Amino acid sequence: MIYFIDDFLDKNLFEETTRRLNSSSYVEYETPGKSFWIQETNNDFNDYVLQKLQKTEGNKLENILGFFRVSNDVVDTNWRIHSDLNIQGEQPDRALVLYMSPRKSNELHGTALWRHNVYGKSLPKETTNEEFDRMIIAEAENLDMWTLDSVVGYGENRAISYPASYFHSKYPNVSWKEGRQVFVMFYKIK
């Protein structure tokens, strides 16, 4: 199930968090074949998000990883269509994207969900790490391997949660000059 919640953070927390994001620098974090520009989060913020998700989903949840990231018209401009089934050696059940910055584009913008020509809409949970890595390197930018299924539109303080096995990317691949700031979290159902 995919769902989204508008006004996810309460107003004070949202304003405080965006002030902090805008007054701090993002640092490059390198992974095989990809760099991200991130800011770390803190336990209080992660706990707030997790508690809100637990209330919404009706399950006890465990955070695997959460951080803020930015993309703009220069930084992080590739498609990188992928699944989140392998996060720091763990297999999350779900992923969350929380849009933090104001929308600066009138074009369709948000989180795209894709269908792979072989696997369909999601990567099988039994997929090996080698196949996961191969797909990221060989197919994440090859639009001939993918069909766009849908796009959940961008909205400031909108959270979208989806199964971690689903193939997705930002949409489109290039964000606006001021930057698309998001919080991402990968989590398990206990």
Regions found by a protein language model. Give the residues of each.
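Catalytic core of non-heme Fe(II) oxygenases with the double-stranded beta-helix
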Residues: 74-190
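Non-heme Fe(II)/2-oxoglutarate
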Residues: 1-81, 110, 117
